[in-house]
């Protein structure tokens, strides 16, 4: 092994990218003066690329980018990204009078920012080993036969697609998680569909997939979005609710609440982000269903609440699913042939759990401080930090883009001390 790293960062998504930006902006220049390495399992930077559906927009303001909430004068703000591509690009965006850019453009912004830090990133490095070496008081990270020593660790592995056991038990390329929706394989299945398509889920991803399929398919090719809830639920994006759950300074309040009160409060706030759909999209979907009945006398493209998939059979070139009602037991099960089953069932933190189990082999859970530090990590000198996985402690916004910049600044301060003010100030001759 080579000389120990001062800091190893596991995972290269918005959380770690915003942290690198905070280090770039830090007055002590840790990127220049310290040995820092990022390890990413993918061959290149990417962020939810499989959901870059044409016409889909971000659900947060572009001002909540990788840098602006921490330092609006940073080079890496979204507005400067636009400006760096020319005045016409900046003017064009401003002329749209929108706070929510397209998902495609925001992904391009993230890739633009990431391209500046390529010398610090080890791609194709799926870190699946993390343990502590007491003899050297260092952490060891590794993938395959390659290992690195590090004094400090930041874990930003993000989330991984979750596929429920029923769907996972059926070995078929016709079952596609929403994270792969825009892949070539998925889009070929969509284009060639004859029997029909089924989307499982009741959140934003499921609704966006249904909408894209609706406009892509023949109007009479069967399409359904099914879920257990009675009806799709609109997301709560009112300003008071946004302030409570998504303003980063409220993490202090959430973290210091008694556990029972905090979990109850977070449960109430699930309608801001989990299994909900933007109201404008729900209105569009309802209108399209109405127009189908008007034109064809029935809905070929359906929204099916109170519906569960009881069984799935793999018939080679298609699937056969049995749909049942959860509440109306008098309703007979329905059998459908489908060409593709899109599973929009969310994500979990499996990669983080694997790393934590290797660091704490005796099933001892990680104790996370308000500053995102693992308090019971074994090193005497170094520290382990986590980001993007502590919503139960810090609040719902902790896993979202809107907190990334502020949290990154806090982590930079924790590891390398406070940064001297670098913001532009008015010239001395001004009053």
Curated annotation (Swiss-Prot):
It holds the Pfam family Lys_Orn_oxgnase. GO terms for cellular component: cytoplasm; cytosol; nucleus. Its cofactor is FAD. FAD binds at residues 40-48, 59, 399-401. Keywords: Cytoplasm, FAD, Flavoprotein, Monooxygenase, NADP, Nucleus, Oxidoreductase. It comes from the Eukaryota. Signal peptide: none annotated. Substrate binds at residues 64, 242-245, 273, 402. This is L-ornithine N(5)-monooxygenase.
């Amino acid at each position: 092994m080579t000389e120990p790293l001062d800091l190893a960062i596991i995972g290269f998504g918005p959380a770690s990218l915003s942290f690198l930006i905070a280090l770039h902006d830090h007055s002590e220049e840790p990127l220049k003066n310290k040995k820092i390495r990022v390890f990413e399992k993918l061959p290149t930077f990417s962020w939810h690329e499989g959901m870059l559906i044409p016409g889909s927009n971000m659900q947060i303001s572009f001002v909540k980018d990788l840098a602006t909430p921490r330092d609006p004068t940073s080079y890496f703000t979204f507005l400067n990204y636009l400006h760096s591509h020319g005045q016409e690009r900046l003017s064009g965006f401003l002329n749209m009078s929108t706070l929510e850019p397209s998902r495609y453009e925001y992904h391009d912004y993230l890739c633009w920012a990431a391209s500046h830090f390529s010398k610090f990133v080890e791609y194709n490095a799926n870190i699946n080993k993390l343990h502590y070496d007491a003899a050297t008081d260092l952490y060891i990270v590794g993938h395959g036969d390659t290992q690195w020593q590090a004094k400090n660790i930041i874990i930003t592995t993000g989330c991984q697609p979750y596929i429920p056991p029923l769907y996972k038990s059926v070995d078929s390329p016709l079952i596609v998680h929403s994270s792969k929706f825009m892949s070539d394989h998925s889009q070929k299945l969509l284009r060639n569909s004859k029997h029909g398509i089924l989307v499982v889920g009741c959140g934003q991803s499921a609704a966006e997939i249904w909408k894209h399929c609706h406009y892509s398919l023949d109007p009479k090719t069967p399409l359904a979005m099914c879920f257990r809830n009675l009806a799709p639920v609109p997301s709560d994006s009112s300003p008071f609710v946004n302030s409570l759950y998504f303003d980063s300074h409220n993490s202090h309040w959430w973290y210091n609440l008694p556990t029972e009160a905090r979990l109850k409060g977070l449960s109430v706030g699930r309608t801001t982000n989990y299994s909900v759909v933007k109201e404008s999209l729900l209105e569009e979907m309802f209108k399209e269903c109405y127009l189908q009945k008007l034109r064809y006398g029935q809905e070929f493209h359906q929204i099916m609440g109170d519906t569960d998939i009881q069984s799935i059979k793999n018939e080679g070139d298609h699937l056969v699913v049995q749909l049942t009602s959860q509440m109306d037991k008098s309703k007979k099960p329905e059998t459908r042939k489908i060409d593709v089953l899109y599973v929009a069932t969310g994500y979990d933190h499996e990669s983080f759990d694997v790393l934590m189990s290797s660091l704490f082999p005796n099933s001892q859970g990680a104790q996370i401080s308000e500053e995102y530090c693992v308090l019971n990590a074994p090193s005497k000198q170094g520290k382990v930090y986590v980001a993007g996985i502590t919503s139960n402690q810090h609040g719902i916004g902790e896993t979202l883009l809107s907190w990334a910049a502020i949290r990154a600044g806090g982590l930079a301060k924790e590891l390398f001390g406070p940064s001297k003010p670098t913001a532009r100030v008015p010239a001395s001759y001004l009053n």
